[in-house]
């Protein structure tokens, strides 16, 4: 990944088959309808499933191809989600505490059983 730029964009209907194939290979939900995908050199390497709520954007799932884990892909995906949340005028990203250690490293804090990160 060094020297390569991760291309992140919203998931579109035309991506559903690729997202399903990615989930079959790397885990995660095969039925993501709302979220972001990350590509390196045209290859799908990450899928972030999300739900937009009243004041927040919820991270439902974040899957990175195993060979690219711990290479900042997850961090980039969450930063792009924060940018999108700000455009949607949402104040918080929230996520399950399942991956609390990683989420703390990327700016989340635990509050009342969920991980939260202020947007903006």
Annotate each predicted stretch with a short phrase.
Residues 96-117:
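Conserved active-site alpha-helix within GNAT-family acetyltransferase domains
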Residues 62-69:
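A short, internal acetyl-CoA/4′-phosphopantetheine-binding micro-motif in the GNAT/acyltransferase core
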């Amino acid at each position: 990944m060094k020297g390569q730029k991760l291309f992140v964009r919203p998931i579109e209907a035309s991506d559903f088959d690729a997202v399903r194939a990615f989930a079959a290979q790397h885990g995660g939900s095969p039925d993501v309808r709302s979220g972001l995908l990350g590509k390196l050199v045209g290859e799908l390497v990450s899928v972030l499933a999300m739900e937009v709520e009243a004041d927040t954007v919820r991270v439902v799932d974040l899957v990175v191809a195993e060979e690219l884990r711990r290479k900042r892909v997850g961090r980039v995906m969450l930063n792009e989600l924060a940018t999108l949340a700000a455009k949607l005028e949402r104040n918080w990203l929230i996520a399950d505490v399942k991956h609390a250690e990683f989420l703390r490293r990327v700016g989340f804090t635990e509050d009342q059983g969920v991980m939260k990160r202020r947007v903006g």
